[in-house]
């Protein structure tokens, strides 16, 4: 099936059926699912961050329970309330549609079809000659990327002042961005709709250079440390696509439609996390549904799989690498198994499973970018993840033993740190609405929570976690987002959306801010925190946690990526 036609054909195949379940509802269930639900539950309803919504999984549940989950959300999960958008009839209709949904798609990873979508958008070599140095910033290392999930945008921000430089359409629900560490003027993004895009962040306006449709639904992305190759991972069709990092020409497809799972059965698997490593010429590729990790050697002809590490755990998700100094730097690929509540430790050197770190019953580890740092007090390297299902930060050492569990107010998705901050910054974005507006600042030496960033509907606070004393307050007034239509860029053929820092009207009914993903910026002096529900990014002092200012007029900002910071993080 042609990748470019998958979305429209899938929608058409179920559109007629949607009217059968509407009752008195006029909701277009396929369209609503595609826009609002697909990101967490998948295009073929197989689940991911969200639950499996295929009929066989749903038939075990009562319809009224499912309807209530749509209307009221599910506490300590990523499932929000939809009562602002759904009537009870709408929710009943959606449940009926899901219960009777049939997968009529036939996805297969085909390298020739993928090559047919490869598109040149600007002349890379000409731009490099014309603009040998960064134009819009002092250095390309000053750039921070941000994704606006629901607007399908990649933004480029000058991290030294918070100025939004440009915003680019880059596929539905842009998920991950990375940079080429050998030549950091080149950046890449992957959207959940399977579009891989390459940008030149030194040229004016950060133009898109090329794009290729690697699948229908994608997640992971990694660039080899030698700067030659970029690899993207797919949920649908299962597999990964390796491309030339200077052109995006597709070179090889790794099909995972028939792999051995944890039960010894042959089935298709989605590809979750991907990571390069400075330890050797390897990519790690996590097979989400098979509980195993492939290790690819990109230095050899035809880029073979040279390692196959099985039995890690059920439902593999995101991962990060260790930062132990010396020869073991980047040696271990630490992958979350959300179905088995473990962090699997995959050894690039031995190409085996070195250990499993059990995070606790039903914790569902989700490290996001993860954290690895040297604890001077203990005299050893430590690593940390947050947990989706409970408010818990789990810390372990390089002997793969847990050294501390730190409670927070709710489940999280991201935990980050950097040399210039004394803290681990842990979000609680999957917690309850009463607490998902908090980020915990955990002391990297004492492993105790020192401070909490808490943003209310009108006021933000920095709180001393021990005394509960408010250390700082700031104006957190919410403003309507000022939007612009798509337009043509100064250079290239992609579409951009203009930005203004002019504030819109004050929001009449403010919402609870939902904070996530802390990322260093401005040479480590700042930390950026995204706010999903308010459409802005907060900037804070890295060493103190004090608020500085907001970047407004964004739509569900999610992932941020500092080029300078990630240059020194293995696999990031």
Stretches with model-predicted labels:
Residues 19, 23-27, 43, 67-72, ...:
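Predominantly soluble domains enriched in secretory-pathway, periplasmic, or organellar proteins
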Residues 39, 44-48, 54-103:
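Extracytoplasmic electron-transfer domains, predominantly the class I c-type cytochrome c fold
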């Amino acid at each position: 099936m042609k990748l470019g036609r998958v979305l429209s054909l899938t929608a058409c195949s179920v559109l007629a059926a949607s009217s059968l379940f509407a009752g008195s509802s006029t909701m277009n269930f396929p369209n609503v699912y595609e826009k609002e639900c697909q990101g967490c539950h998948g295009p073929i309803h197989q689940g991911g961050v969200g639950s499996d919504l295929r009929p066989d999984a749903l038939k075990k549940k009562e319809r009224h329970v499912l309807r209530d989950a749509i209307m009221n959300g599910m506490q300590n999960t990523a499932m929000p309330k939809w009562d602002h958008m759904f009537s009870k009839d709408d929710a009943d209709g959606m449940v009926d549609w899901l219960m009777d949904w049939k997968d009529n798609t036939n996805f297969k990873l085909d390298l020739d079809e993928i090559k047919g979508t490869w598109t040149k958008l600007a002349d890379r070599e000409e731009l490099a000659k014309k603009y040998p140095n960064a134009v819009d910033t002092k250095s390309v290392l000053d750039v921070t990327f941000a994704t606006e999930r629901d607007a399908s945008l990649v933004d480029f921000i000058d991290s030294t002042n918070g100025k939004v430089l440009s915003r680019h359409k880059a596929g539905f629900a842009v998920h991950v961005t990375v940079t080429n560490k050998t030549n950091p003027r080149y950046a890449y993004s992957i959207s959940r709709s399977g579009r891989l895009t390459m940008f030149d962040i030194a040229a004016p306006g950060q133009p898109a250079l090329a794009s290729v449709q690697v699948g229908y639904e994608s997640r992971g992305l990694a660039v080899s440390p030698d700067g030659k190759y970029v690899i993207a991972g797919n949920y649908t069709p299962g597999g990964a696509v390796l491309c030339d990092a200077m052109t995006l020409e597709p070179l090889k497809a790794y099909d995972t439609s028939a792999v051995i799972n944890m039960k010894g059965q042959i089935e298709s698997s989605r590809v979750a996390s991907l990571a390069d490593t400075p330890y050797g010429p390897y990519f790690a590729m996590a097979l989400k549904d098979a509980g195993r990790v492939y290790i690819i050697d990109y230095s050899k002809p035809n880029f073979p799989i040279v390692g196959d590490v099985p039995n890690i755990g059920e439902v593999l998700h995101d991962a990060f690498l260790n930062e132990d100094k010396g020869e073991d730097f980047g040696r271990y690929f630490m992958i979350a198994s959300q179905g088995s509540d473990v962090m699997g430790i995959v050894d690039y050197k031995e190409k085996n499973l070195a250990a499993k770190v059990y995070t606790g019953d039903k914790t569902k580890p989700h490290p996001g970018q993860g954290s690895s740092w040297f604890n001077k007090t203990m005299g050893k390297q430590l690593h940390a993840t947050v947990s989706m299902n409970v408010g818990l930060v789990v810390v372990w050492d390089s002997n793969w033993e847990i050294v501390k569990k730190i409670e927070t107010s709710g489940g999280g998705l991201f935990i980050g740190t950097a040399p210039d901050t004394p803290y681990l910054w842990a979000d609680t974005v999957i917690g309850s609405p009463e607490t998902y507006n908090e980020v915990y600042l955990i002391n990297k030496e004492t492993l105790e929570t020192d401070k909490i960033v808490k943003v209310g509907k009108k006021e933000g606070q920095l709180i001393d976690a021990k005394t509960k004393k408010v250390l700082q307050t700031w104006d957190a007034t919410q403003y309507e987002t000022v939007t612009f239509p798509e337009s043509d860029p100064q250079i290239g053929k992609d579409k951009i959306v203009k930005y203004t820092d002019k504030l819109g009207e004050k929001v009449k009914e403010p919402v609870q801010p939902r904070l996530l993903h802390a990322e260093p910026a401005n040479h480590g002096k700042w930390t950026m925190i995204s706010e999903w529900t308010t459409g802005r990014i907060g900037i804070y002092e890295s060493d103190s946690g004090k608020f500085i200012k907001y970047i407004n007029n964004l739509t569900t900002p999610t992932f941020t990526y500092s080029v300078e910071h990630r240059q020194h993080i293995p696999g990031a």
